[in-house]
Regions:
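Short, ordered, surface-exposed loop/turn motifs in non-cytosolic proteins
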Residues: 35-37, 43-59, 63, 83, ...
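Short, conserved, GDST-rich strand-edge loop motifs in beta-rich repeat architectures
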Residues: 181-188, 361-391, 433-459, 505-516, ...
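Short, acidic Ser/Thr/Gly-rich low-complexity loop/linker segments typical of extracellular
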Residues: 58-80
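The canonical Cys-X-X-Cys-His
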Residues: 168-179, 229
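A short, solvent-exposed loop/turn motif at the edges and junctions
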Residues: 57-63, 85, 89-104
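Structural signature of eukaryotic scaffold interfaces centered on beta-propeller domains
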Residues: 264-284, 338-356, 416-424, 483-500, ...
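Conserved beta-propeller blade signature
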Residues: 287-290, 297, 358-362, 426-430, ...
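Short Pro-Gly-centered beta-turn/loop motif in secreted/extracellular proteins
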Residues: 48, 77-85, 93
Length: 705
């Protein structure tokens, strides 16, 4: 084990969010507690309701802050603060940030605030998606694109939804769009260029991510995309502002947030974990774990200490790029020049805790070429059925008690990972384009045999309708009604269904994306059988207003209903397979069960010019609070408001949205979530949902480089 950094006051942040008791933080201000800071926020109009009170200190080992929302009369209470010197200030829509007031726990304050002098001044603290909504996309009748000698839209863009999808899943895969760094480009002087188009052309080529941004723009249609981004920037420079977001209302005013520093400006955290998803009572008050690049970040929320460890590999690994950036830049970064580290050879992606104190991690432990036992000619049951030649990422775990990394080789590519609720503690892994993989961790623990403990299945749909998998067509071949059909595509999200034991994956592309059900059967891999379901899209049986696209994350509630965030169209969608009239046969190719879907539009503005759904927000993933760790009830699905500085909780019984906004620092770019119950008897104080600032470009955040 090698400790590379102990983190102090800079870098990314880790946030715990909880909904406090029904009285709320504002009404609770009458409480008398030496660990609290209380008071009232006033303007010339009186008490200011629904604004955020931020208490932060630099006295602890990491950045530490708590944020609450004022009640109807402008009163507030910031509870249970560690003994330290704090700066307390107020941020709210329609206001300018207040002055900072020195305070210690036990103090009571009156914080005076003033209205913003202009709409432009007020809008500077709006979430990024509100600014991004000002970008005007090409009209639906301009698709499909006719290329650089036609309308400038890429020929591969078949319809407006694909363009919108690229503005989301392409342009926002690494960072927010609409923040100050992207809408105003303060890191360069636009006046140094012949036009704003030329400035944008330069901007998308800088840094190690430049080649990726460049190629993405080319697919959309470079000339047209640059014109639209330049027009967006010019209109904002001329004074155009988005509509004002609503202040927190109702239960949203009962939200309390605790934030601590972890990571740094360079070493991103991709995802975090706090407990075993199957039992959120495990590991109360224990550290929170995050992985990304080549590092494991461990933060103790009790002692406020954070450390980053270098991860190890089985074989020596050379310096390499990752899915976000290469190892070189054609044009130096305007922030970092050529200085930024490129050592990301381990490609750690996603963590998951089990019930035995092990932190399982999808990471690269060896070069990509698979060993012989994975390939054609092997006698491994899965390899003889469907051999795999290469794997870009494998598996490891961090033994929390022993403080050591253990590597587990896999033939299949890994990305996300989830434990099933079965006797074998089966760990299911996404990431391959062709198969879904698993590791029988009970067998692995008993034998130490990583080969015998793993298996995988291709995703083959029973389109012949005979109830089993026989001869099948390959991807790209015409459908044959007498044969089954193998599907491929990047398996992104994954989740086991606790009701029937089936495994579900989310495939993002092609538009509209799909979710795939895998039934393993009694004798895998031969008994594996898949089903595929797409959200309603270009379906004549469904009104276009109910179409959706761009599924990324996937999770399930305790009733077996699937939930997926449609990051392209801007929905949180549920899928109930029990409502489907058709499960297999020649029509079971994706659009055959619109009756199983319910689409809930997420809050926030739409992009200019969209003809159907096209929210300006981006939902990187989603998570279901199965066990009421947040305080809104069991089985509450939450979409990441990755572009809106928020977690978006849906109350499924009423269809009501609860927006959990993180107002400071701007740039709350979230990926994964986790919830933990530290003390079930302590009410809201004993539970919460954990999320992290997970942008690849933390320096874009408020207060960054």
């Amino acid at each position: 084990m090698r400790v590379t950094s102990r983190f102090g006051l800079a870098g990314a942040a880790l946030a715990a969010v909880a909904v406090v008791g029904l009285a709320g933080a504002g009404a609770a201000a009458a409480a008398d507690d030496d660990g609290d800071i209380s008071g009232v926020v006033r303007s010339a109009a009186g008490g200011e309701a629904g604004v955020w009170v931020i208490a932060e200190t630099a006295d602890l080992e990491t950045t530490f802050r708590k944020i609450v929302v004022t009640g109807d009369d402008g009163r507030f209470l910031v509870p249970d603060l560690p003994d330290a010197a704090y700066e307390v200030w107020v941020r709210g829509y329609g206001l300018v940030d207040s002055e900072k007031h020195a305070a210690r726990p036990g103090d009571e304050l009156t914080v005076e605030v003033a209205a913003a002098a202009t709409p432009q001044e007020a809008a500077r603290i709006y979430p990024a998606n509100y600014w991004y909504s000002l970008l005007e996309v090409p009209a639906e009748d301009e698709f499909p694109g006719t290329g650089p000698n036609g309308n400038g839209i890429g020929r591969g863009m078949r319809h407006q939804a694909e363009w919108v999808d690229r503005l989301k899943d392409g342009c926002q895969l690494c960072h927010q769009m609409g923040n100050m760094a992207t809408r105003e480009m303060p890191m360069i002087d636009v006046d140094d260029f012949d036009s704003t188009v030329a400035a944008w052309d330069h901007r998308v080529q800088v840094g190690r991510s430049g080649p990726s941004m460049n190629s993405g723009l080319n697919r959309m249609g470079r000339e047209r995309a640059l014109q639209l981004f330049a027009d967006w920037t010019d209109r904002i420079a001329a004074g155009e502002v988005p509509p004002e977001p609503p202040r927190p209302q109702g239960v949203e005013r009962n939200v309390g947030m605790t934030m601590g520093g972890w990571g740094d400006l360079i070493a991103m955290v991709h995802d975090e974990i706090a407990t075993d998803k199957r039992n959120p009572h495990l590991y109360p008050n224990a550290p929170i774990y995050g992985v990304g690049g080549a590092g494991l970040t461990i933060t103790d929320p009790v002692t406020h200490q954070s450390v980053r460890l270098d991860m190890t590999t089985r074989d020596p690994m050379p310096e390499r790029g990752d899915s976000y950036a290469g190892t070189t830049a054609l044009i130096p970064s305007p922030y970092w020049g050529d200085e930024r580290s490129t050592a990301r050879g381990h490609s750690a992606h996603n963590p998951m805790l089990d019930a035995d104190g092990r932190l399982w991690i999808t990471q690269r432990i060896r070069p990509s070429d698979n060993p012989a036992w994975c390939k054609e000619g092997s006698d491994h049951p899965s390899a003889s059925h469907f051999p795999i030649d290469r794997s870009q990422r494998q598996l490891s775990y961090w033994d929390v008690e022993a403080e050591e990394f253990v590597h587990v080789d896999t033939c299949y590519m890994t990305h996300h990972l989830q434990f099933a609720e079965d006797e074998s503690d089966t760990l299911w892994l996404s990431g391959s384009t062709d198969v879904v993989g698993w590791l029988n961790t009970k067998l692995y623990d008993e034998t130490g045999d990583e080969q015998a403990a793993q298996g995988w299945c291709p995703t083959i749909v029973d389109t012949s309708g005979d109830g089993r998998i026989g001869e099948y067509t390959e991807p790209g071949e015409p459908q044959d009604p007498t044969k089954d059909m193998r599907l491929d595509g990047f398996a992104y999200g994954i989740i086991p269904n606790p009701v029937d034991g089936s495994i579900w994956i989310a495939r993002r592309l092609p538009v509209p994306g799909s979710i795939v059900r895998l039934e393993v059967g009694d004798s895998p891999p031969e008994s594996c059988i898949a089903e595929v379901y797409e959200p309603p899209f270009e379906n004549p049986a469904v009104d276009p207003s109910q179409w959706g696209h761009g599924g990324r994350g996937i999770d399930v509630d305790r009733n077996g209903v699937l939930w997926t965030a449609l990051g392209g169209s801007g929905h949180l969608a549920s899928f109930d397979r029990s409502k489907c009239q058709v499960l297999n046969g020649p029509t079971a190719t994706g659009q055959h069960c619109p009756e199983g879907w319910t689409l809930y539009p997420t809050p926030g503005p739409q992009m200019k010019g969209v003809s159907a759904a096209g929210s300006a927000d981006f939902h990187y993933y989603n998570w279901v609070d199965q066990f009421n760790t947040l305080g809104l009830g069991d089985n509450v699905p939450i979409a990441n408001g990755t572009g809106s500085d928020a977690l978006l909780a849906l109350l499924p019984d009423t269809g009501e949205w609860v927006t959990l906004r993180v107002p400071y620092p701007l740039g709350f770019y979230t990926r994964g979530l986790d919830g933990r119950i530290d003390d079930a008897e302590a009410g809201w104080k004993g539970r919460g949902v954990w999320a992290s600032y997970d942008s690849v470009t933390n320096w874009h955040n408020e207060g960054g480089k």
